[in-house]
A protein has these predicted regions:
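Short, surface-exposed secondary-structure boundary micro-motifs
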Residues: 33-35, 71, 87, 101, ...
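Rossmann-fold dehydrogenase core element
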Residues: 256, 269-309
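Mid-domain Rossmann-like dinucleotide-binding core that forms the NAD(H)/NADP(H) cofactor-binding site
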Residues: 136-215, 220
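NAD(P)H dinucleotide-binding glycine-rich loop of Rossmann-like/cofactor-binding domains
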Residues: 88-168
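Glycine-rich cofactor phosphate-binding loops and adjacent beta1-alpha1 units
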Residues: 157, 200, 204-280, 322, ...
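Glycine-rich beta-strand-centered segment in the early N-terminal region that forms part
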Residues: 20-35, 48-94, 133-135
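C-terminal hydrophobic helical "lid"/dimerization subdomain
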Residues: 245-249, 290-353
């Protein structure tokens, strides 16, 4: 089978590798049809290894058809269309027993620590797979996993019907945050970014307001929109130093601040504000399959979110040049999906990029 193998920084190759021949008792073998590229894939190529254990087949946002089932699996049958979650949990630790499988003490990720779905076939635990509704095509379904990450974050931030939310950073996962907030009935939904094209996309996804933070005072505008009160929830999705404090400045008393962006440098925060205004600060990690994947699929089935967040569909042989590099260089205008059914050109096989 063909697979995209990560060997280290700047080194991803499409190669022929053996098809998985050992399906665990609780696993399913999936014939992959579509796989979206995650920002973490481009980060590993650009400046990794960070989380990836090379060599490894990349890909943790994928869908396909069940080809084989383990003997303990009763939830799926051969021929079922499924989407897989990304994280594998033990099911027995304290966090798993609480339903917080994303915090599992033995958590690891498909496509980073074990072989993933940028390949013709992949083995995935049946417990993290969900059936795809008939009215959701494979390209759309390939977006369910990143959408689930956004929905999990919104749940952590207590984004809800009738409550206002500001989203700082609406590229990549930010578009899903906007779509999820709109689907949950939040109002107003305020998109904040430094890119007018991304802000235009956020408006198409249903944001009620769009603020370019390079030309406008975002905090002042949020306060003006909310009559000086601030929004109920703020999601910081950029990882840019200083933005957590801005999030705190625009949230209302008793509100919620969620840090979704990955901050690799220390930030200064006015902790007195948290105390005097009783603001809750939250982190968020990945998603919980049982809660977030079904909601993502339901929204994708009932909306045009997929069409609005999709940049393009490419072949596996185009992965590096037309997928990984545009993401690493911030040229991508949305999600990029790989079609595993497109023939791989002979001149692309074993190509190093």
């Amino acid at each position: 089978m063909k697979a995209a193998i990560y060997y280290g920084r700047g080194d991803i190759r499409v190669e022929d590798v053996p098809r998985p021949n050992a399906v665990g008792l609780d696993d399913v073998l999936i014939a992959v049809s579509k796989a979206a590229i995650c920002g973490s894939d481009s980060s590993e190529w650009d400046h990794g290894p960070v989380l990836a254990v090379a060599p490894v087949i990349l890909g943790h946002e994928f869908v396909g058809v069940v080809e084989e089932v383990g003997s303990n699996v009763t939830t799926f049958a051969v021929g079922d269309r499924v989407v897989s979650g990304a994280g594998i949990s033990c099911g027995t630790c304290e966090w798993c027993r609480e339903g917080r499988t994303n915090l599992c003490a033995k958590y690891f990720t498909l496509g980073l620590q074990v072989n993933g779905g940028l390949s013709d076939y992949v083995v995935s635990p049946a417990s993290i797979c969900r059936s795809i509704p008939d009215d959701v095509d494979d390209v759309s379904a390939a977006l369910a996993q990143p959408f689930a990450v956004a929905l999990h974050g919104l749940r952590r931030a207590r984004v809800r019907d009738g409550a206002g939310v500001a989203i700082i950073g609406v590229g990549g996962i930010g578009g899903f945050l906007v779509a999820g907030a709109v689907a949950r009935g939040a109002s107003p939904v305020i998109a904040i970014d430094i890119d007018d094209e991304r802000l235009s996309g956020a408006k198409k996804l249903g944001a009620t307001h769009a603020i370019n933070a390079t030309t406008e005072d975002a905090t002042a505008m949020v306060l003006d929109i909310t009559g000086g009160l601030g929004v109920h929830s703020v999601v910081e999705a950029t990882g840019v130093q200083g933005n957590p404090q801005k999030a705190l400045d625009m949230v209302r008393r008793g509100g919620d601040v969620l840090i979704l962006g990955l901050h690799t440098r220390a930030n200064q925060l006015d902790l007195l504000q948290f105390t005097l205004r009783e603001v809750d600060l939250h982190g968020t990690l990945a998603h919980v399959c049982a809660e977030d994947l079904p909601e993502a699929l339901a929204i994708l089935a009932s909306s045009n979110v997929a069409a609005l967040v999709l940049d393009k569909v490419i072949g596996l042989d185009e992965l590096v040049e037309d997928g990984i590099k545009p993401l690493a260089e911030r040229r991508a205008r949305g999600k990029i999906v790989v079609d595993l059914h497109r023939p791989v050109r002979r001149d692309a096989e074993s190509k190093r990029g």
